[in-house]
Amino acid sequence: MKSERKAEIIAVGSELLLGQITNTNAQFISKQLAEIGVNVYYHTAVGDNPERLKRAIQVAQERSNFIIFSGGLGPTKDDLTKETIASTLGKELVLNEEAFESIQEYFRKTGRDMSPNNRKQALVLEGSDVLVNRFGMAPGMFIQENDTFYMLLPGPPSELHPMFENEAKPLISEKLGLKEKIVSVVLRFFGIGESQLETDLEDLIDAQTNPTIAPLASDGEVTLRLTAKHEDEKETERLLKETEAKILARVGEYFYGYGETSLVREASKALRDHGKTVAAAESLTGGMFSEWLTDLEGASSILSGSIVCYTNQVKQQVLGCREETLSSHGAVSKECALELAEGVRKLTGSDIGISFTGVAGPDTHEGQPVGKVFIGLSTKDHTDVFEWMFTGSRSGIRKRAVKYGLHHLLNLLKES
């Protein structure tokens, strides 16, 4: 066995090449493999064509020694992944009785007749380790031929994700003889750019060995993935905590959460933890702030209400923004944002009022440039207004405004 696994992911399905779906499976698998120290060098997508798939396999065999396939394990004629791999490797397909019984049981429970082609899903490569599919019909497979690993996974993410985490990942670790415990933690930051964060942590990043530090910028946020390995799991955790403490000592003011969380999820949690409610006056954002909150469970306990106050008439008549403020300073102003935040808080009886006013484009407004944004945040004791200048598309500016509003709301709750 070679000391290093060079992995390649081959996604099978013409729908990928037609742009009908996005290949999120490759992203997920790459991330999961990185957590156990397996490097992915290539992503390949190929349509439902046996000749082209066979050629893709041959190319992968020349440059990779761990080839993972996703898709093409279904019952229809265009599902040809395992047949093509069997032909390429000179293997037979054999019926897996356990998988076949599971398929039959599914049809019995649903009261449907099983068509003959469903039996095809229970066929596996002879000599392979079978990966149980608890959320679908087609089992996965793992087989080693000479020094190369081959893994076959179903295409639907709802089946692939649990199969990989519960079946494939432990099996890969076993096959690779991994003794070290590899643990990762993701730190999430907002309000600081990737370049500034890397500058502030330059010496830590330059000296990284164990744990490794991997920055990633995405949609106005920055994440740091810390990955440590050691045979003693407690030592792995200690290494991570030690490095995390050094990082947060420098840029902790921008840190908001771990793992796959988000600003809206953390802000919602903070509102619940503090027993507070928020109400929104949304001019620029047009209801986006409240939409993001209500996408999460339990929003009724934290969101009192939201007013989409796009016109000056609604700003005045519903939220009490003074005519003098609008005529002297305009709707896109610090003064207007302040009165809107206070107005919606008082109108709804909420603990916190938040307001959004600005210019999303494409044209300037009342002398204010595209991207100028004011966010008001009001409590019974104090009202603050934050001024920002964003760039990007109309929708991008609105999304950025909501994120910064959540950022300011979260900071307010942390300080209280």
Curated annotation (Swiss-Prot):
Gene3D superfamilies assigned to the protein according to its UniProt record, in alphabetical order: 3.30.70.2860, CinA-like, MoaB/Mog-like domain
SUPFAM superfamilies membership: CinA-like, Molybdenum cofactor biosynthesis proteins
Pfam families according to UniProt: CinA (PF02464), CinA_KH (PF18146), MoCF_biosynth (PF00994)
SMART domains: MoCF_biosynth
Paired cysteines (S-S): none
Similarity comment: family membership: Belongs to the CinA family.
PANTHER family: NICOTINAMIDE-NUCLEOTIDE AMIDOHYDROLASE PNCC, NMN AMIDOHYDROLASE-LIKE PROTEIN YFAY
Protein name: Putative competence-damage inducible protein
Gene: cinA
